[in-house]
UniProtKB/Swiss-Prot annotation:
The central region was initially thought to constitute a DED (death effector) domain. However, 3D-structure data reveal a previously uncharacterized fold that is different from the predicted fold of a DED (death effector) domain. It consists of a large, hydrophobic central cavity that is poised for cofactor binding. GO terms for cellular component: cytoplasm. It comes from Danio rerio (Zebrafish). The keyword Signal does not apply. This is Tumor necrosis factor, alpha-induced protein 8-like protein 2 B. Acts as a negative regulator of innate and adaptive immunity by maintaining immune homeostasis. Negative regulator of Toll-like receptor and T-cell receptor function. Prevents hyperresponsiveness of the immune system and maintains immune homeostasis. Inhibits jun/ap1 and NF-kappa-B activation. Promotes Fas-induced apoptosis. Belongs to the TNFAIP8 family. TNFAIP8L2 subfamily. One of its GO terms (biological process) is innate immune response. It comes from the Eukaryota. Keywords: Immunity, Innate immunity. InterPro entries: TNFAIP8-like (IPR008477), TNFAIP8_sf (IPR038355). Pfam families: DUF758.
């Protein structure tokens, strides 16, 4: 028997359309200014670290696509009880990561690349488990791409180097994360 569902088709179409529209101008219409500023700084960090503009754009675009698709899944109540619990744990892990990033930034000589990398890796694994049955292999690849990029211990070391060229970006990222934590967004 054929199992056609217009609701499923609409969801797939919406995810596809939104992922195609993951441009900077479109993102600014969907997300708040603080999140947009953080994404801009993450792009700059990636660009300076890799020396490759297109790779930096791809990482941030992958991040945006994943966030949009997960938002669509939430909006359409696609997660079961177990997945919703996992989503809450993922959100807690992100919050922990943000607070850790800020703490490492604010308190000199406390940065530990292993701790930060582990938090990002654990977050990636939780997210992959959450979307396992909902997103395509290509989207799973995007999640891996984003988290593996930002969990790179060498990138993190350069980012937290107090006299390094990435320090101004870290300042802005942490200021943005602080705002998101204070207003309850994160």
């Amino acid at each position: 028997m054929e199992t056609f569902s217009s609701k499923d088709m609409a969801l797939k179409a919406q995810k596809k359309i939104l992922s195609k529209m993951a441009t900077k101008s479109m993102v600014q219409m969907i997300i708040d200014d603080t999140s947009s500023e953080i994404l801009d700084e993450l792009y700059r960090v990636s660009k300076e670290y890799t020396g490759n503009r297109s790779e930096a754009q791809k990482v941030v675009k992958d991040l945006i696509k994943v966030v949009v698709k997960i938002g669509v899944l939430f909006r359409h109540n696609r997660f079961n009880e177990e997945e919703l619990k996992l989503a809450q744990n993922f959100q807690k892990k992100l919050r922990q990561g943000a607070m850790t990033a800020i703490s490492f930034h604010e308190v000199d000589f406390t940065f530990d690349k292993t701790v930060m990398s582990d938090i990002l890796t654990e977050s990636r694994d939780m997210l992959l488990k959450l979307v396992n049955t909902h997103l395509t292999t290509k989207s799973h690849g995007r999640i891996n791409h984003v988290f593996n990029h930002y969990a790179d211990p060498e990138l993190l070391t350069q980012l937290y180097n107090s006299s390094g060229p990435l320090k101004p970006h870290l300042n802005k990222i942490c200021n943005g994360l602080n705002k998101l934590l204070e207003n309850g967004t994160l």
